[in-house]
């Protein structure tokens, strides 16, 4: 199902003022928290408590950005060791993860960066929380842009105490774009690696 949406997104139009190319012009890898807060002067919010992303943390978010007209929340992920900007993650709020948003975001990224260098698909399985996933990867210069689409299938309701009527008891859909430097965690130096 995700493959159909990814392939269908190729023909849609996108806005030229999308967040990804603009952010890449505005920020610098290794930049400090204070520098980000100054640069976005009031548009960025410092969180009362940091969000942990494993190898990084985010205590600054930027609201009001869009990709292909779809609103996203921007997380500036800071390196735990150096405390400098390590990665940028733009995430669609969970309640807004749907096929039109997926198509709009994919089309906008393809309008800005061309065809992905690689597309990876992850099939539904119990070990993956019954989530199907698709990932598009673009490598441009020293930057890697990765769009990740995850969706939960009906099998995810297996094991719920009261079945489907009890609502979600596991993972829900997720739609995010990660911007990273080549060679950093999760991104290899080989072009198009998922």
Which residues does each predicted region cover?
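Short amphipathic alpha-helical patches
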Residues: 7, 59-64, 132-133
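Non-cytosolic coordination micro-motifs
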Residues: 15-55, 89-194
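Mid-chain, structured segments of secreted extracytoplasmic proteins
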Residues: 58-103
């Amino acid at each position: 199902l995700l493959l159909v949406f990814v392939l269908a997104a190729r023909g849609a139009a996108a806005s030229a003022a999308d967040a990804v190319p603009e952010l890449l012009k505005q920020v610098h890898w290794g930049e400090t928290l204070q520098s980000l807060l100054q640069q976005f002067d009031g548009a960025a919010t410092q969180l009362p408590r940091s969000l942990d992303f494993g190898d990084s943390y985010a205590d600054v978010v930027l609201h009001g950005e869009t990709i292909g007209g779809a609103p996203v929340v921007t997380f500036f992920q800071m390196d735990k060791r150096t405390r400098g900007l390590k990665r940028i993650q733009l995430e669609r709020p969970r309640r807004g993860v749907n096929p039109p948003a997926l198509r709009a975001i994919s089309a906008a990224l393809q309008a800005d960066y061309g065809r992905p260098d690689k597309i990876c698909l992850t099939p539904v399985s119990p070990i993956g929380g019954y989530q199907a996933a698709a990932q598009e990867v673009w490598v441009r210069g020293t930057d890697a842009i990765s769009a990740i689409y995850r969706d939960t299938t009906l099998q995810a309701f297996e094991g719920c105490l009261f079945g489907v009527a009890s609502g979600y008891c596991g993972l829900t859909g997720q739609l995010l774009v990660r911007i990273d430097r080549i060679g950093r965690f999760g991104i290899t130096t080989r072009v198009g690696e998922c």
